[in-house]
Each structure stands twice: as structure tokens, then as C-alpha cells.
Regions:
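N-terminal subdomain of nucleotide-sugar transferases
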Residues: 1-37, 219-222
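A short helix/loop element that forms part of the nucleotide-sugar donor recognition site in Leloir-type
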Residues: 29-33, 177, 181-195, 199
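Acceptor-binding helix/loop patch of EC 2.4 sugar-transfer enzymes
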Residues: 46-56, 101-135, 184
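An aromatic- and histidine-rich active-site surface loop
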Residues: 61-67, 73, 78-116
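Membrane-proximal helix-turn-helix segments that form the acceptor-binding/catalytic region
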Residues: 89-92, 96-101, 127-147
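Carbohydrate-associated surface elements
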Residues: 153, 175
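Conserved donor-binding/catalytic core segment of Leloir-type glycosyltransferases
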Residues: 189-210, 216-219
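Conserved small/polar residues in nucleotide/adenosyl-binding loops
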Residues: 230-234
Length: 234
């Protein structure tokens, strides 16, 4: 959302093609189309099942991607499309807009597929879905005008495992704002909690692909210390 607002403030006409919310909607029914803060939003209704199981996620992925495919001409009306790596088949559709309409393609890599699925033993290497993902990677990275990686480590992995050009891959950390300097300590809402303490913060995902053993080890080693605060949105 910050990216969308920044593009709008820079003078671009911005639209968002996204899924219709199932559990995050507040206040009841959400319109399928609306103009919010100068941004045209088109929400697509699709089959949404439970997200906890593998089969449910696959149904959600394919259903949403299919409905985006039906709106491919809408994507083609824009000069550029910014597409994220999740669901993993979605960038393939965006790459077709590049081929059919000449729409510039910006691919934002949150996750690397099929590696995420194979490392977590969700999929077997060489399976039909893995081969499909590898084909999608070839199409997307061949057609992308720009690729955004979340870290230098991810960029190095992309350059090592994908047919990507170094100059086209840019590192933009997530949830980062260049506000030009440090904030005033008096404006820190946690100033009383952190006063006189050395604070180490971890702001990141806590999932199957993260090294949680280090964090859990610190919790166990320092469990008697009254100096730890863990907050999360489980």
C-alpha cells in the first residue's frame, strides 16, 4: 500500500487488481470496485477454501489466478504492471500482458518457488507442479523489465539460480521507509520500556522458511531474565 501511495503522489495513475477479502474485511460487505484515495481498486471474487491445508491453498491459488487471467485485457491497459510472487502462478499471467500488450513487467520476489515448497517438503523435486514453476520462472525472468528482491542474499540467489541480469535486479527491503535520519527518542512510544536497556529487535516473518531455532534458543537461555518482550500476530 505504501508503494501504491508513493506512485500516486509521484503523479502516476495507479490501479490495484486483487482478491476479494474473506476474513480481513471490516464493517461488512466490501465493494468489488471503488476509488479509494485516488486509487482504482478492483477486487475479484474467486473460490476461497481453508488456507491451512495444502489442497485448500492450491484451490485458492488456481482459482484466483484464473480470475486474473480473465481480466488480462484490463492489465494490458496499464503501461506497467507490478506483480508479486504469491500466488506463484500469478507472475506467469502478468508476463503474458508483457507479451500481448507490451506492458512493462516489474516482478517483486517475496518468495522463491519451487525452492520454498521443496525445502519445506511440501512438494517433491521433479513433480509436475515443480516443473510448472520452473517454466514460469523462465518466462517471468526472461520478460521482466525489473526484478525486486527483498535482500542482497535473495538477489544473489536469484542471480545464481535464475536467468536474470544483475542490472535489472534491485534490492528493496520490505516495510522500509527512507525518512532521512533517526526519530526523536521522546516520540518513541516504547521509551519507558527501553530506557537504559540495550534492545535487539527482530521484525520479520516467523514461518517455515525462517531460522526460528536461534530465536527459540535465546528464549530458553534467557527465560529467567526479566528483560524479554515478544510480540507477534500469530
Amino acid at each position: 500500500y505504501d508503494t501504491v501511495l508513493a506512485l500516486r503522489d509521484a503523479g502516476f495513475s495507479v490501479g490495484a487488481l486483487c482478491g476479494y477479502p474473506r476474513e480481513y474485511a471490516e464493517g461488512g460487505k466490501v465493494p468489488t470496485k471503488e476509488d479509494a484515495d485516488g486509487i482504482y481498486i478492483h477486487r475479484l471474487k474467486y473460490i476461497q477454501t481453508g488456507r491451512t491445508g495444502f489442497l485448500g491453498r492450491i484451490v485458492n491459488y488456481f482459482s484466483f489466478t484464473f480470475h486474473v487471467l480473465l481480466h488480462l485485457p484490463e492489465i494490458g491497459k496499464y503501461r506497467a504492471v507490478v506483480v508479486y510472487s504469491n500466488p506463484p502462478i500469478l507472475p506467469w499471467i502478468a508476463s503474458w500482458a508483457k507479451s500481448l500488450f507490451g506492458t512493462k513487467l516489474v516482478f517483486v520476489s517475496y518468495d522463491l518457488y519451487p525452492e520454498v515448497a521443496t525445502v519445506t517438503n511440501t512438494l517433491r523435486e521433479g513433480s509436475v507442479i515443480c516443473r510448472l514453476m520452473n517454466h514460469i520462472n523462465k518466462c517471468v525472468f526472461r520478460r521482466a523489465d525489473r526484478v525486486v528482491a527483498l535482500s542482497s542474499e535473495q538477489k544473489n540467489c536469484i542471480l545464481r539460480t535464475r536467468n536474470a541480469v544483475d542490472e535489472l535486479v534491485t534490492v528493496i527491503p520490505n516495510w522500509y521507509r527512507d525518512e532521512g535520519g533517526l526519530r526523536d527518542r521522546e516520540e518513541n512510544r516504547f521509551r519507558e520500556l527501553t530506557a537504559g536497556r540495550f534492545v535487539v529487535s527482530y521484525f520479520g516473518n516467523m514461518g517455515t522458511m525462517q531460522d526460528m531455532d536461534t530465536i527459540l534458543g535465546a528464549i530458553r537461555a534467557l527465560r529467567e531474565e526479566n528483560c524479554l518482550l515478544y510480540t507477534s500476530d500469530a
